[in-house]
Amino acid sequence: MFTMKKSLLFLFFLGTISLSFCEEERGADEDDGGEMTEEEKRGVLDTLKNVAIGVAKGAGTGVLKALLCQLDKSC
């Protein structure tokens, strides 16, 4: 009876080890996929937002300078 328990415990141990290896491989495959994480999405959106703000500030400055020039007639 003891040898049977020992062999079953050994098989359970081997099954657990092989299952953990399968989960690690599956996790590695999922990480290499084309999906973006929330942090990556946030980083991309922050970059796009900063670029848009910079462009808007540049355009706004140009428009304000043109209006000031027209109002003062100093062009």
UniProtKB/Swiss-Prot annotation:
Residue ranges that the Swiss-Prot or TrEMBL entry lists as coiled coil: none
Cystine pairs: 69-75
GO cellular component labels: extracellular region
Presence of the UniProt keyword Secreted in the record: yes
Subcellular location per the Swiss-Prot or TrEMBL entry: Secreted
Signal peptide (UniProt feature, chain positions): 1-22
Keyword Mitochondrion: no
Propeptide: 23-40
Alphabetical UniProt keywords: Amphibian defense peptide, Antibiotic, Antimicrobial, Cleavage on pair of basic residues, Cytolysis, Disulfide bond, Fungicide, Hemolysis, Secreted, Signal
UniProt record, GO biological process: defense response to fungus; defense response to Gram-negative bacterium; defense response to Gram-positive bacterium; hemolysis in another organism
InterPro entries, A to Z: Antimicrobial_frog_2, Frog_antimicrobial_propeptide
Pfam families assigned to the protein according to its UniProt record, in alphabetical order: Antimicrobial_2 (PF08023), FSAP_sig_propep (PF03032)
Predominant location category: secreted
Domain of life: Eukaryota
Tissues showing expression: Expressed by the skin glands.
Function in brief: Antimicrobial peptide. Active against some Gram-negative and a variety of Gram-positive bacterial strains. Active against fungus C.glabrata 090902 but not against C.albicans ATCC 10231. Shows hemolytic activity against human erythrocytes.
Sequence similarity: Belongs to the frog skin active peptide (FSAP) family. Brevinin subfamily.
Protein name according to UniProt: Brevinin-2SN2
Provenance organism: Sylvirana spinulosa (Fine-spined frog)
